[in-house]
């Protein structure tokens, strides 16, 4: 298979983890933000080390991008460039998630932040053969009184570039019990729901995310392995797993790439999708993810078609966009 030419779909990609290093350098100079001494050092600070010890070390790579992403221009540009980078490797549909609350440090309103991200995406959609949507994330450690503000701020953009609500950040057992009020609020406003769960060993969180938070999709979810309740509910309800194989190895969720359960899950009828998570932090692309999965697990063209269709069906896109995406199957 020509992996670059394959049509691809990425449903789990973080904006602040997918910024071009040269853009960081350019914006940091504009905003007088202190940088590491040279480009190599900047890249090093943005990219997870080979011997990354855990998710917390992985998350440290977001510090510099978040410093520069505090103006309308920076957010719009970075949004555009992410969609441009994806389009140039034949990603036909991309859902990007970010936490607007992390971009208020210089006084931007939540509305301005969301509008800037959507504007950058729309500019890329006009220029390239790519469709997209945004997912509003909150981090588990956020003050709870800010969560409804994010949901309210995104509501005017629903169906116009925003589609879903996500809970992210470091994972602790039992976190779902704190959030039903907020996912219910988001559902009432018209959001779809995806939740990061089962990334850091806690398979029970996946079961809770589906039963308590009404999650339609699960970010990562690899640790349904070993938790029968979680495994069964994901399989029975056809809850899509947004797997991010390279990232899962880097954060030590999975010991090595060949141990990733994606192929095993697929064989057993679980809905799996292939995603990047963070293009810059993980130093990856969709082409790389698809290639590694197919080559490591011996997946055929037919297997890839099935995963591509899973991604289309699981996307928080309109029926019209889904029909458009299904049209690319014959190119595989």
UniProtKB/Swiss-Prot annotation:
Site (Important for catalytic activity): 220
Cofactor (UniProt): Zn(2+)
Active-site residues per Swiss-Prot or TrEMBL entry: 199 (proton donor)
A Pfam match: A_deaminase
Family matches, as InterPro entries: A_deaminase (IPR028893), A_deaminase_dom (IPR001365), Ado/ade_deaminase (IPR006330), Metal_Hydrolase (IPR032466)
Note on cofactor: Binds 1 zinc ion per subunit.
EC number, UniProt record: 3.5.4.4
Catalyses which reaction(s): adenosine + H2O + H(+) = inosine + NH4(+); 2'-deoxyadenosine + H2O + H(+) = 2'-deoxyinosine + NH4(+)
Binding site for Zn(2+): 12, 14, 196, 277
Domain of life assignment: Bacteria
GO molecular function list: 2'-deoxyadenosine deaminase activity; adenosine deaminase activity; zinc ion binding
Any one GO BP annotation for this protein: nucleotide metabolic process
Amino acids binding substrate: 14, 16, 169
Database matches in SUPFAM superfamilies: Metallo-dependent hydrolases
Keyword Plastid appears in the UniProt entry: no
GO cellular component annotations of the record: cytosol
Entry keyword Mitochondrion: no
Keyword field: Hydrolase, Metal-binding, Nucleotide metabolism, Zinc
Alphabetical list of PANTHER family matching this protein: ADENOSINE DEAMINASE
Matches recorded under HAMAP family: A_deaminase (MF_00540)
Family designation: Belongs to the metallo-dependent hydrolases superfamily. Adenosine and AMP deaminases family. Adenosine deaminase subfamily.
Described function: Catalyzes the hydrolytic deamination of adenosine and 2-deoxyadenosine.
Protein's recorded name: Adenosine deaminase
The organism of origin for this protein: Vibrio atlanticus (strain LGP32) (Vibrio splendidus (strain Mel32))
Name of the encoding gene: add
